[in-house]
């Protein structure tokens, strides 16, 4: 994979991690938007609670991308690479995923101190609209790769990729549009 793709996938994974972790902005019951407004908090944005999930999500999406890319000769990608010692995960060695996680951790370790030093902006109260494109791209890549996986008749590989990501998808959906908090009924 080229270095630009790494950057985009890391940005997308970072957006998903932020969406899962950033605090919500309280809003009156009468003006609640359909998507939860998230507060831009530089301390949270550059904390371990974002750092580790972002690196994990970066390597996690590769667990769907690489097995189908390895079979590029069966679809329009073509045979672009191979592993001399195929791994147990659909032919991809585990070291590949460790490498992705390490690249993600190093990249974020460089970015986070820079983010903390940037001058404070006066962004809108909610950063939800700014995160949605990254979240959408992450899941767009996932849907594309799963679609190709099923299209080339790799049903087991496709189902395992779907099931691996299902828990994160459910958490994200609850976070995106789930209950805005319990209100006392009375």
How does the language model describe each region?
Residues 1-186:
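Aromatic-rich, lipid-facing transmembrane alpha helices and their immediate juxtamembrane interface loops
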